[in-house]
Amino acid sequence: MRAFVIAMESEAAVVRPFLREGDGLFVSGVGKVNAASATQKAIDAGADEILNCGVAGGFDPAMKIADVFEIDRAVEYDFDLAQLNGTEVGVHNERTTPYFGLQTRGLFPARTLGSGDRFSDSQADLPVLARLGVTIRDMEGAAIAHVCEMNGVPCRILKCLSDVHGKGAMTDQYKANLSKALLSLGQAFPAWCGK
């Protein structure tokens, strides 16, 4: 079974018209715990491939609202055991790298995704995001990739930008551009999902 793990109902609306018989759709809610839980539920239900798509924020000044990207690796940038064991931000005890590798189809430019449990205009995260090579940020993708890796299930992620750092308050951009980003995501989705 191919399963889609999607954070928000507005994003799930993009997916529904393209579901094939036998596909699963799991609307998780926002955040890493919700996404991880829904991903495990999908795998327990028989998913042998997990797909995630949705809107996200960009951190490369060359990026534009409604640009679409495949994700080739993801990191949980708010997971930090450095004071406990000296590991790099994002590295879990059982791993040697902060990155979870993802499959891509080569249809859109590939980027590194950083996932954390906050939506913020704060500048505080910028140094760690830059150090990790993150150019796109969301609140779910790395958690989905993490659960997939733990279960040996392939995962693909597609993101469309609703906001870009340095081009105004990200919260204001998100609110103003969500519909445009969802439209762009819907145009990119059919080829990417393989329908």
Where are these regions (language model features)?
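Glycine-rich phosphate- or other oxyanion-binding loops that anchor nucleotides, phosphorylated ligands
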Residues: 2, 6, 11-195
